[in-house]
Amino acid sequence: MEALSQIEGRAIPYGAKNVDTDVIVPAHWLKTITREGLGRGAFETLREVPDNIFDSEEFAGAPILIAGDNFGCGSSREHAAWALLDLGIRAVIAPSFSDIFSSNAFKNGIVTVVLSQYEVDRLMEVAQSDPIAVDLETQTVVTPFQDRFPFEIDPFRKHCLLNGLDEVGLTLTRDAAIADYESRQKTQTPWLTTGTERAA
């Protein structure tokens, strides 16, 4: 997982409330188990409308998405996070998120930023023409107009995102401790490993 410190650039001022995971990525995209190419399915039904914001050249490659209350509600499909990531989104800002979506986003290296409705509205306004930045180190969202909006994030999640640690990467940071434990287990409880070693 790529380490994150600051995410800066244009933000897609979407703003819709109660956006469920079926809107983020329709069910027929769930047949795939690969993450590559899922960005084509992100907001597919909305992109069928001409001049939609997700296909606008102005917001091409935008790393930030601004949404409304309860973003990511509905089914728990992890493909929703995969699709956003493949679209290039590294941070989503909203007044609230579905807990399951927020967890899936974190596990895939997407920062979910909770701000007040007033702050989200202000960022929606700025995003129409100017970039914004999400600073994970200082836990603030800033604009070119001196707006500084602090946000909360779980310390463990912050550590993992800053260091690019997914579940596998986090386990590997404890590799020496795991090896030490396994060595002690072989000595203290040899009957647990003898049969396995013979089979190997």
Swiss-Prot record:
Q: In which pathway does it act?
A: Amino-acid biosynthesis; L-leucine biosynthesis; L-leucine from 3-methyl-2-oxobutanoate: step 2/4
Q: Which SUPFAM superfamilies match?
A: LeuD/IlvD-like
Q: Which E.C. number(s) belong to this protein?
A: 4.2.1.33
GO BP annotation list: L-leucine biosynthetic process
Report the record's disulfide bonds: none
**Gene Ontology terms, MF aspect:** 3-isopropylmalate dehydratase activity
Q: Which HAMAP family match?
A: LeuD_type1 (MF_01031)
By sequence similarity, the record places it as follows: Belongs to the LeuD family. LeuD type 1 subfamily.
Q: Kindly provide the name given to this protein in its UniProt entry.
A: 3-isopropylmalate dehydratase small subunit
Organism of derivation: Erythrobacter litoralis (strain HTCC2594)
Q: Which gene encodes it?
A: leuD
